[in-house]
Amino acid sequence: MADERFVVTNLRFATACGMSDRLRLDLVLNDFVAGALTSGKIDILSDGTPWRPLIHVRDMARAIDWAIDREPDNGGDALSINVGSDVWNYQVRELADAVARILPGTEVAVNPDAPPDKRSYRVSFAQFAERAPNHQPLVGLDDAVSDLVDGLQRMAFGDPDFRSSQLMRLVALETLRGKGLLTDRLEWTTKPK
């Protein structure tokens, strides 16, 4: 199977956002857009200062395309690489404000009494910029928000209880476990249909 051109590329993606056939609303930007559409409000559970790197699903696909065609002289036989863009490192409050810009009238509420969020992180994507200059993220934040708004409106989304729906990964996993289709180790017990 392997020859001198065989390479392994581990793509460490920033947090995904955007519409997809398997939409997830437990991702920060997707959650904010869904909340704004259903309630006119975004509740930030932290003080809004934690950092999150994001990448749109279309840009993730572009990175996969790059990884499939990557040559060994571009990073070696085995490469682990952060995939995203340095300009897509945002504070949570900035993400909520972007949604409110696209959906005027959206109220943004932060929790000033929240303890510091230990999940705050900024990521360097310099290596990806160097190794994949023709596959850099193209979708901007406002376009990502608009894409989500349009997609959710097209599917007539309006479930105010979406956080307990199958569009949340943990809910979907618990449902599959409850039906006996997944083990506690998240392995299939039978082949899914």
Predicted regions and their residues:
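Conserved beta-loop-beta element that borders a ligand/cofactor-binding pocket
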Residues: 1-20, 30
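Active-site proximal helix/loop that lines the substrate pocket
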Residues: 15-21, 49, 88
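C-terminal substrate-binding subdomain of Rossmann-fold SDR/epimerase-dehydratase oxidoreductases
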Residues: 40, 45-193
